[in-house]
Amino acid sequence: MEEMPKTYDTAAVEQRMLDKWLEGDYYRRSAGVGDCTVTIPPPNVTGKLHMGHAMDDTIQDTFVRFNRMRGRSTRWILGTDHAGIATQTKVDKKLAAEGISRREIGRDKFIDACWDWTNEYGGFIVEQVKRMGCSVDFSDPHFTMDDDYAKGVRKVFCD
């Protein structure tokens, strides 16, 4: 008989459960009667999630799971927000710490630096949502700078 470990390995158990849920594709749109679709108010990519995000995601997760258990077709859509001015500020501070400014590197390189920041922190946020055990459909994430979203914003606010 295998001896029980003296300490509980939280990270290993969490990873094993997460892998099982993701491999089982449990969080894709479920079949059912009636539609329940929720879009996460997208956290911006200027940092990491905090307790307010955890509380908000817990409430949404409870709602989605409740509807899934009642047999409704459910989908919880993951998204992140570019947070343009806030991201610019973060990248400006990062560049300043390196002894350079956005004016010195020029517009194109600065935009590249903003995209690098977005990719780094956007990916981290998605991993945090996974680690919280949120029943989000990870197969189709959205970003506010995606073409479809940007076109929709221009249509609503500019046309």
Model-inferred region functions:
Residues 1-159:
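N-terminal, positively charged nucleic-acid-binding surface of large information/translation enzymes
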